[in-house]
């Protein structure tokens, strides 16, 4: 597959009886959730799919796929990652970045420049952005990605400066 695919969400659970499924989205824009997309189970290859409708209901994104017309049919999609071609992503400002572009960046403490590790993964449990940072020793450090803790992202240097809450890093030693 030559085009670059970007994860934009994870399918959660069916909604109603007409084939809609909840989507935990990684993007604010709902526009990317129409037309040709790709679905991926765990570590398998992505498969093409088509979203025929998308909407926001009580703050939750709901999508409906072609060929999935009822609740039991869409149940098989639960837990799959929704991917789109990078070319479908909306333009962003020069001072913004897509999360997928930050993966692999070095994460350092703001006050000492000590390297904590590399940004490995981003998840959204309970709607809160949570960064998984892998230390040089191979340990995982989880950091809530809020402005108080993430001070600077330098895309040119591929560097993220953080000021974690007191005691957080000690939990992982």
Swiss-Prot record:
Q: Which residues form the PRC barrel domain?
A: 94-168
Its GO CC terms?
Answer: cytoplasm; ribosome
Q: Where in the cell is it found?
A: Cytoplasm
Major localisation: cytoplasm
Pfam family name, one: RimM
GO BP terms, alphabetized? ribosomal small subunit biogenesis; rRNA processing
Q: Which GO terms describe its molecular function?
A: ribosome binding
What keywords are annotated for this sequence in UniProt? Chaperone, Cytoplasm, Ribosome biogenesis, rRNA processing
* Membrane-spanning ranges: none
- The source's superkingdom equals Bacteria
Q: What family is it from?
A: Belongs to the RimM family.
Q: What is known of its domains?
A: The PRC barrel domain binds ribosomal protein uS19.
* Quaternary organization: Binds ribosomal protein uS19.
Q: What does this protein do?
A: An accessory protein needed during the final step in the assembly of 30S ribosomal subunit, possibly for assembly of the head region. Essential for efficient processing of 16S rRNA. May be needed both before and after RbfA during the maturation of 16S rRNA. It has affinity for free ribosomal 30S subunits but not for 70S ribosomes.
Q: What is this protein called?
A: Ribosome maturation factor RimM
Q: Which organism is it from?
A: Lawsonia intracellularis (strain PHE/MN1-00)
